[in-house]
UniProtKB/Swiss-Prot annotation:
Disordered: annotated segments: 366-435
SUPFAM superfamilies: PP2C-like (SSF81606)
Ranges of Low complexity composition bias in the record: 409-418
Protein name per its UniProtKB record: Protein phosphatase 2C homolog 2
GO molecular function: metal ion binding; protein serine/threonine phosphatase activity
Positions bound to Mn(2+) 1: 71-72
Keywords from the UniProt entry: Cytoplasm, Hydrolase, Magnesium, Manganese, Metal-binding, Nucleus, Protein phosphatase
Gene that encodes the chain: ptc2
Taxonomic lineage of the native organism: Eukaryota, Fungi, Dikarya, Ascomycota, Pezizomycotina
Cell location: Cytoplasm; Nucleus
Outcome of mutating residue 71 to A: Decreases activity
PANTHER family reported for this sequence: AT28366P-RELATED (PTHR13832:SF565), PROTEIN PHOSPHATASE 2C (PTHR13832)
Biased composition (Basic and acidic residues): 381-392
Length: 435
């Protein structure tokens, strides 16, 4: 657990934007930590902003949006660099121009590492960051992940993980770490870093004889490709400041309640962060971290209002019906909460309903069982052939899976954007700061 303040910083930096493909809201909060080390990016039209005019398509069906969350550790410099540059670097890859978005994301993550190494300003830099990003077209989502920030898709009220957390104790990750000359002790790389993949962290990338994806810690991402359907409602990308406190399913249900209650997406993010904020700084780090959360609503040809109506009446996840008059619900929820008391924490459901649980913070935020099952959830969403095509470092897998895979291998509209270091002002979309 990092150093904490005597009182949390609950001011939030929030923004929103939309086009005919998707609508998003994002918010970031420093919380109990002594500094803000998160960054994020939101770009509604990646082609228009960062490719040459001849490469830019005016066809809305070919428009690509980009969203990313970068959770820094050991300082904020690498996270800020990532938030400002990853999307630009991805858009400059040859594979991006050829329409191979999956390869562009892989190449772009590694190119970001190289760009930092080649910049004299970062010669002695020791910090690093996670990277959870998504590129969204009208018909498809690409999710790239390095670290333990997470991307979760809401499908008719059910959580579908599109990434898995890269932890050193995972068998596939541990195998790479050991092969590169490192070790895992107490769930940490070389007894130090709690992640097995990250941008930066160059002290773990010093083996010149090894390729970048084979280093003790690598920036090489896993990429999940998802074909969109009418059942897909929204994507949530957030740092572990959220996921350490809430399960993926709980977040999806919370977001869906807010959408059904006609709340703005950035407001749902703010309410979720208030829920996750620890009532004090003695919870062992749970609820004390920086928090950043992006919700991307997938319009699928619908208006924002139609998406709200669909969330209210179809599928699981909504546990009560809402009256037509939204004035019956507390939509703003601006008053201070949570951190001022140790017991009687007020939990806000996504529709503004208040709940006072009996559990303490540690019991309330215990997601051990879900985290244990997360790798298998992601694997179930991918055919074996898709995972076999992933070169470099394998994703989470059992020893049996690893053996069988080894045997198989031997035998065979107007553009709008915001790019925001969390905690600073935004551009291209209205900024909202609340406390």
């Amino acid at each position: 657990m990092g150093q904490t303040l005597s009182e949390p910083v609950v001011d939030k930096t929030s923004s929103e934007g939309e086009d005919d493909c998707c609508i998003y809201g994002v918010s970031a909060m420093q919380g109990w930590r002594i500094s803000m080390e998160d960054a994020h990016a939101a770009v509604l039209d990646l082609h228009a902003k960062y490719t040459s005019p001849e490469e830019t398509s005016t066809d809305p069906a070919k428009r690509l949006a980009f969203f990313g969350v970068y959770d820094g550790h050991g300082g904020d410099k690498v996270a800020l660099f990532a938030g400002e540059n990853v999307h630009k670097i991805v858009a400059k890859q040859d594979s991006f121009a050829k329409g191979d978005i999956e390869q562009a994301l892989k190449d772009g993550f590694l190119a970001t590492d190289r760009a930092i190494l080649e910049d004299p300003k970062y010669e002695e830099e020791v910090s690093g960051c996670t990277a959870a990003v998504s590129v969204i077209s009208k018909h498809k989502i690409w999710v790239a992940n390095a670290g333990d920030s997470r991307s979760v898709l809401g499908v008719k009220g059910r959580a579908k993980p599109l990434s898995f957390d890269h932890k050193p104790q995972n068998e596939g990750e541990k195998a790479r770490i050991s092969a590169a000359g490192g070790f895992v002790d107490f769930g940490r790389v070389n007894g130090n870093l709690a992640l097995s993949r990250a941008i930066g962290d160059f002290e773990f990338k010093k083996s010149p004889e090894l390729a970048p994806e084979q280093q003790i810690v690598t920036a090489y991402p896993d990429v999940t490709v998802h074909e969109l359907s009418d059942d897909d409602e929204f994507l949530v990308i957030a740092c572990d400041g959220i996921w350490d406190c809430q399960s993926s399913q709980a977040v999806v249900e919370f977001v869906r309640r807010g959408i059904a209650a006609k709340q703005e997406l950035y407001r749902i993010c703010e309410n979720m962060m208030d829920n996750c904020l620890a009532s004090n700084s003695e919870t062992g780090g749970v609820g004390c971290d920086n928090m950043t959360m992006i919700i991307i609503g997938l319009l699928n040809g619908r208006t924002k209002e139609e998406c709200g109506d669909a969330a209210e009446f179809r599928g699981p996840g909504i546990r009560n019906q809402f009256e037509e008059n939204p004035d019956d619900y507390d939509m703003e929820n601006d008053r201070a909460r949570g951190f001022s008391v140790r017991s009687g924490r007020i939990i806000l459901l996504g529709d503004g309903t208040e709940l006072v649980p009996d559990q303490n913070d540690e019991e309330l935020f215990d997601q051990t069982e879900e985290d244990r099952d997360l790798p298998s959830q992601v694997q179930r969403e991918l055919p074996d052939s898709a995972r076999n095509e992933r070169e470099g470092t394998p994703g989470p897998q059992s020893k049996t899976d690893a053996t069988s895979k080894s045997e198989e291998g031997s035998s065979a509209s107007t553009s709008e954007s915001t790019v925001t270091p969390a905690g600073s002002s935004t551009s291209g979309a209205p900024e909202k700061s609340t406390s």
